[in-house]
């Protein structure tokens, strides 16, 4: 079922397609905030494709975490976000996350870590960038499989400050 929505103010139209809702015949759009892909579907996506998605997931979590942690100016929010999502910081978090991973999660992490990337930012080593890509690949796979609680658990545990023993 497809519907055409006309925006009279802008003079444009948008075509929306989805399944007809069984109760009222209305349009039921796919919810991209709540996906539940099967492992075989996720394995068909390249490691860098998963990392692309996971990069956005991780950044959204960092931004949410920063907004929740107190009042900061937009400039402070931006600088803090950049400091947490850069490859060296993600690599450090990946190192802290590794002991917490299941066998399947570790396989997804390694898939991303071992992916061949063509460009590495100047502020990161090859090893740091590979670890960051592994973290992003894992977060992308977990997000697409609908395992949001697990993403949150890993995120919270890796954002805690390390304890000096």
Model region roles, listed by residue range:
Residues 2-165:
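Double-stranded RNA-binding/processing signature
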């Amino acid at each position: 079922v497809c519907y055409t929505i006309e925006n009279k103010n802008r003079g444009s139209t948008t075509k929306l397609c989805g399944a007809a809702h069984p109760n009222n015949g209305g349009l039921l759009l796919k919810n991209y905030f709540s996906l539940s892909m099967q492992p075989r579907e996720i394995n068909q996506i390249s490691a860098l494709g998963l990392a692309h998605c996971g990069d956005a997931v991780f950044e959204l979590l960092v931004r949410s975490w920063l907004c929740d942690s107190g009042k900061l100016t937009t400039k402070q929010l931006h600088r803090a976000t950049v400091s947490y999502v850069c490859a060296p910081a993600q690599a450090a978090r990946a190192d802290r996350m590794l002991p917490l991973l299941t066998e399947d999660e570790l396989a997804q992490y390694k898939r991303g870590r071992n992916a061949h990337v063509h460009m590495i930012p100047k502020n990161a080593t090859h090893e740091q960038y590979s670890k960051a890509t592994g973290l992003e690949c894992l977060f992308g796979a977990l997000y697409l499989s609908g395992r949001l609680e697990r993403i949150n658990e890993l995120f919270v545990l890796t954002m805690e400050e390390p304890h000096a023993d």
